Each structure stands twice: as structure tokens, then as C-alpha cells.
Amino acid sequence: MRIILLGPPGAGKGTQSARIVEQFGIPQLSTGDMLRAAVAARTPVGLQAKSIMESGGLVPDEVVVGIVADRIDEADARKGFILDGFPRTVAQAKALDAMLAAKGLSLDAVIEFRVDEEALLGRIAKRAAETLARGEAVRKDDTPEVFKTRLDAYRSQTAPVSDYYAQTGLLRPIDGMAPIDDVSRAVEVLLRGLQPVSA
């Protein structure tokens, strides 16, 4: 089972990803973790990424796709994987599809957690107010202003990926505003429907 999780910051991708890992025994692949691991392992692609990152550049799509390609060849990913945080652009989505096709693989589903952005902003503002009321400092990335910037970036850069996968027939929208357990149940039903029935 090879799946991608999409959704804006605060949509619950991390929570749902952890539950999928637990229920289905497939690894969550984070591009950030994979980049760091490839650099630490001094793989050819990792060394290429390291020199780019050290010079302050953005790691090009082909390098990131190369790192994903290496990672999905590992034993724990043979039954499948969850990609979270990648692809972020349509170009990356197309590169991922081409890489998987070259390996004789394809994605099974792209789950998009749909949320009400105003409600998300309200949650963040409430959390910030509660943190301040406890006399604690609000993390810089947890303020409504920063969160709105992250939402805007998601909308402009990553939201088109949703349209791309809708055109391929892989997109499976789920209501990310429902209670966490309801979202988990919806994800589980969807994923169980993807599993082949044993004879």
C-alpha cells in the first residue's frame, strides 16, 4: 500500500500518519528525515544534497526523488509506505510518478484532509491564548500570523498537487475537521478497501 497524505498545516496529517503506521505496519517517509539520513549515510545522493544544503540552496526535485527512490528500496518499505510532506509541487508529483513507474510501482491513493481554514486559524489563536494564560511563551511558528503565512504558502504551492491527483483518479478527500477518531475510522475504511482480499 503506497499512499500520500495531503492537507494544510494543522490538518492532522502527523496524527493520522502515526495511526496508519501502527495499524498497517508500513513506514512513514518524511523527506526531511530521509535527507538527513542520506547525508549521514554518505550515499551519493546524500552527498549531493549535503553540498547543496551547505551552500544554502534548495535541494532540487531530482535529488529529493533520488533519496525517496533509495528509501523505498529498503526492506521495511516493500509492503508499502506513507509519504508525508512530499510531493509539494506538481513537478515533484510527476517526478515521483515517473520514478515509481520505472520501478514497476504506482501509488494506491492520495488522501487529502480537507479543513476549514478559518476554523484552523481559530484553533491556533485559542491555543496561543491558552499558552499565554498559563504564563508560557508562544512558539514563533504557533502564532496565528505565522500560521496564516504557512497556510498561504500551502494554498499557492501544494494545493495544485491535489488537482493533479484528482485528475489521475487517486485523490480521496476526507473531512479533516471531524473528531480525530472519526477521521481515523474514515482513513482505516478507505485503506482497508485498498488491500487485496486474501483467497
Swiss-Prot record:
Residues 126-142 are annotated as: LID. It is found in: Cytoplasm. Keywords: ATP-binding, Cytoplasm, Kinase, Nucleotide biosynthesis, Nucleotide-binding, Transferase. One of its GO terms (cellular component) is cytoplasm. The keyword Transmembrane helix does not apply. Its EC number is 2.7.4.3. Catalyzes the reversible transfer of the terminal phosphate group between ATP and AMP. Plays an important role in cellular energy homeostasis and in adenine nucleotide metabolism. Consists of three domains, a large central CORE domain and two small peripheral domains, NMPbind and LID, which undergo movements during catalysis. The LID domain closes over the site of phosphoryl transfer upon ATP binding. Assembling and dissambling the active center during each catalytic cycle provides an effective means to prevent ATP hydrolysis. HAMAP family: Adenylate_kinase_Adk. This is Adenylate kinase. The lineage of its organism: Bacteria, Pseudomonadati, Pseudomonadota, Alphaproteobacteria, Hyphomicrobiales.
